[in-house]
Structure formats: C-alpha cells, structure tokens
Amino acid sequence: MINIGRLHHVSICINDLEATRHFYMDVLGMDDAQRPNSFNFPGQWFNKNGYEIHTIFKEAAGQVSGDAENIIKPGRDITFARHLCFSVDSVEGTVQTLKEHGVELIEGPRDRGDGATQMYIYDPDGHMVELVYEPWDWE
C-alpha cells in the first residue's frame, strides 16, 4: 500500500493568463506560487493553504482548455459535473465578492442537505468551481 498524503495540486489548461490570474488571485484569494525554473513552457501556479492550482496554456499542453460545454448534463444534478471545490468561510461574503468581480453564480447558494452550503461558478476558461461553506470547519 502507498502511504499518500494530502492532494498536492490540480493542473488545468488555460487560454488567458491575465484573466486566470485575476480569477484565482483577486477573486479566490490565492497566492502566486513559484514554478521550477526548468519549466520552459508558459503557465502559472497558484497556492492557498498548501494546495495548488497549476495552469498550462492549452497550446503547450496540446489540449483544449475548460470543459463548460459538456459539463452539466440534462436531467442530472450539477454535483455530478466535473469540478474543483474550495471551502469558504462565509456564504454572504463569498456571494458579495463574486458580485464585486462580476462572477456569475451558475447555481446556489443551496443547501447540500447536511448543513453545508454549495455555490457553483465558472473560471475564465470554463472550469467549474464549487465553493462550499461547511460551518463546522469555521466554528
């Protein structure tokens, strides 16, 4: 058996570094993380509380960025869609920050059924992001 630790990072393909930087740093409050100097392809890393998002330009990765076109299947709940999820410390504060930055809620805030509140948004490249408030994490 492998003894794994926490999830280290998620890597996503992007189109526009400035829009991505604004979303992950200014809206979600992540910090710039140092990329290895040996990386000879464009992208940026973001860090918050020891977790990282690694971004790579779609041309360098040879992949399409985002997946919003196929993400919410008719007749299925949004929770079945591929997404990243970050915990947040306030529903009201999160909604206010999203409004201030012109980020549209695609669903929520809504009760998850166990006392938590879910909100769903898209990043600039169409990656779905869930923001979840679990009050027991912040008490």
Map each language-model feature to its residues.
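Residues that flank catalytic or metal-binding motifs in active/ligand-binding sites
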Residues: 6, 42, 49-51, 80-82, ...
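Core segments of cupin and vicinal oxygen chelate
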Residues: 13-58
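N-terminal beta-strand motif that seeds the catalytic metal site of vicinal oxygen chelate
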Residues: 1-19, 39, 82-84, 135-139
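A short acidic/small-residue loop/turn micro-motif
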Residues: 61, 113, 135-138
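Short, P/G- and charge-enriched loop/turn segments at secondary-structure junctions
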Residues: 69-74
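Vicinal oxygen chelate
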Residues: 14-18, 78-124, 128
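Short acidic/His/Gly/Ser-rich catalytic and metal-binding motifs that mark active-site loops
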Residues: 63-66
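Short glycine-/small-residue motifs
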Residues: 131
